[in-house]
Amino acid sequence: MKIHEYQAKEILRRHKANVPFGIVIDKKENASKAHDEVTSKTGGSVVVVKAQIHAGGRGKGGGVKVTKTKEDATAAVDKILGMQLITPQTGPEGKKVLKVYLEQGIDIAKEYYLSILLDRSIRKTILMASTEGGMEIEEVAETHPEKILKIAVDPGIGLQVNQARQLAFELGLPAESHKSFQSLVMAIYDAYIKEDASLLEINPLILTKQNEIIAGDCKIDLDENALYRHADNAAFRDITEEDPLEVQASEFNLNYVKLDGNIGCMVNGAGLAMATMDIVKLAGAEPANFLDVGGGANKTTVTNGFKIILGDPNVKGIFVNIFGGIVRCDMVAEGIIEAAKAVDLKVPLVVRLQGTNSELGREVLNKSGLKITGVDDLREAASTIAKLIK
């Protein structure tokens, strides 16, 4: 689950990490009061106004402004709050800014990059750092891979202070900043583990002119499967930042991810769903979604799935690919027929049924009188739906 920067920094504060003071607002009339509170609390005059959206590259899109007066800060809030912010990560449609974060300005000497994530290939947590802070780490990896440092953390013993110290030396940090750096690294690792995060990224990690290390910006992705252990973090969910169809799918307990194609896919099982999307692309078409209905491919589930798929105006056809293990294909077929009637299906529908009672399921579809194309072979089924939408 993605969260906003101000929420990520709230998590870091729980774990005693050094982060700037800031206040989040969602009304323009609160800008002046928030500015005064930040400056009086910190004793500084510089306030950074930051758009709060679930996407990076906010500065490039005009979503981050450094201000030195109250007038400049309120003007920045007036411009940013409510704007449609377009960044390299939002796509051309952008995201509407519903909250802004007013944060104390930091006296920056140098910017670095620091993150913690899981490397599944070695089954260890990785601490990753770079001297190229403030840049997209993907760009650094492509142009200067030698500038990315990695330290693997044994999950049995966790991050050790000597590893944080090693990283400080490898980054070339001034000796006066090592204690501050080690303290922050240990704090964010503690946050990453105890909050069940899947990613914790600080970019930029700031070295101040006073040799203090501060988390200038922070991104945290939380493991949704662990939110039952963190009621406070679950409350961070902002559905206004999520795709409306994905929100609706979660209400139906469906695993749905919207994509950019035009063939809606409904499959039982995540592995088969990914294979189905691959075969659709090989057929020369593009999947419009990932949709795993799991073991509950019944009338209600299929109907809800069709509603979600058809909620995307780009969908020109639907490909249902079901393997009957526990679930019976004849029951699925009945669900498909009822669902097609319930949503008044107008687009081509190709169905592939294999497994338990698959022959009976195909017979049910053939007798339905509906325009449903049944295909046994997976490659042929993908080619069929690709041809039908042309």
Curated annotation (Swiss-Prot):
- Disulfide bonding pattern of the chain: none
Protein name in the entry: Succinate--CoA ligase [ADP-forming] subunit beta
ATP-grasp domain residues: 9-248
Instruction: Write down the required cofactor(s).
Output: Mg(2+)
Amino-acid positions noted as binding substrate in the UniProt annotation, renumbered to this chain? N268, G325, I326, V327
Q: Which reaction does it catalyse?
A: succinate + ATP + CoA = succinyl-CoA + ADP + phosphate; GTP + succinate + CoA = succinyl-CoA + GDP + phosphate
Keyword Methyltransferase, does the record have it? Answer: no
Which positions bind Mg(2+)?
Answer: N203, D217
Which terms in the GO cellular component ontology are assigned? cytosol; succinate-CoA ligase complex
- This protein's source sits in the domain of life called Bacteria
What are its GO biological-process terms? Answer: succinyl-CoA metabolic process; tricarboxylic acid cycle
